[in-house]
From Swiss-Prot:
Residues 17-160 form the Globin domain. There are at least 12 different components in Midge globin. Keywords: Heme, Iron, Metal-binding, Oxygen transport, Signal, Transport. Pfam families: Globin. GO terms for molecular function: heme binding; metal ion binding; oxygen binding; oxygen carrier activity. The lineage of its organism: Eukaryota, Metazoa, Ecdysozoa, Arthropoda, Hexapoda. It comes from Chironomus thummi piger. This is Globin CTT-Y. InterPro entries: Erythrocruorin, Globin, Globin-like_sf, Globin/Proto, Mb-like_M. One of its GO terms (cellular component) is hemoglobin complex. PROSITE patterns: GLOBIN. The keyword Acyltransferase does not apply.
Amino acid sequence: MKVLAIFALCIIGALATPCDDFKIMQEAWNTMKNEEVEILYTVFKAYPDIQAKFPQFVGKDLETIKGTAEFAVHATRIVSFMTEVISLLGNPDNLPAIMSLLSKLGKDHKGRGITVKQFDEFHEAFHNFLHTHSVWNDNVDAAWHCNEKEIRKVINANLE
């Protein structure tokens, strides 16, 4: 138990220190966070194995489900979670909340059989969407890369 507490403190410290361009990341996110359906569609299109992990979408034609309320609701859940985490970044007082959210996400997905590889695939498709649907430059890329790296450490630690 002590090891987990020390590990959590190390992750909190990592989230607190290396990335100081939270505003740049948040501004880029704000330009495209309302494209929930397109974000999830892009992920499923790039990685059908991820779609297969969603029981309500297994075996269904992506083009058909894209326009459904069920797809929109689930896409909104995912993007709302991301929005919550991104909005909390940049304030050290929020680190326990961020850790709790990300740890729970990893644990919940581990219980559903999601692997680190699939989270990496999701990240890759999501990142490609960001590049093409938001204001993107070297500063934005650096901010996203640094913050995502730290966020994924927490999620991955709870998936393994």
